[in-house]
C-alpha cells in the first residue's frame, strides 16, 4: 500500500513578514546524505517581481529535523549589485554526499538582456561538507545547447526545485537536473521560449551534458519505481 503522510507540525522557514525589504520566492528543498535539511530560496530586495534587481540565493540549514535553522547567503552579492540569481535547483549525490546547487544569473536590471535572458549564465555551487561551505563554478560554456531544429538554443534557467539521482540499475547514480532554454531567432532579432531539457552527469558531477529540448516551460523531475522519469 502507498504510505500515508500525516502532518504533525509546521515550520515557517522563510518569512517575508519579518522584513519589509525582502521577498522570498521559488524554494528548493533537499535532504543530505547525513540527514541535514537544506532549504534554498530567492531573496529579492525591494520588490517581489522577477528580474527586478539584486536577487540572492539564501539557504536555511537544519541538523535537528527542522527544529532550528542557520542561515547563509550562498551568492553573496554586493549591496549595489543589480544582478539576479534565480531559480535555485538542488540535487544531492547520495553516494558521495556531494551537494549541487544550480542557479541562473540574469543580467543587470535595465538592460534588454535582463528581460530576454540571452546573456544568462549557468552557475553551479557545490558543497562537500554537508552544506557548510560552497564553491562556485560557471558552467555556461560546458552545457550550452547549441543549434537544434534550426535555431540556437541558449541557457534559460533551471527547474526550479530539485533534481534527482537515479536508482534504476541501467542509469544508477546518474544525476539529472531540469533546465529550460531560450530560442534565438537571428533573422527576427527575437528571443523566445526554447523548451525544456535536462542536464545530466554520469561521473558524480565532474562533467555535465544536456539533452535535446522539447516544447514546454518550467518543470521538475522524479523517478518512478520502474526507472521512468
Q: Which functions belong to the PLM regions below?
A:
Residues 2-229:
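Asp-box/BNR beta-propeller blade signature and adjacent active/binding-site loops
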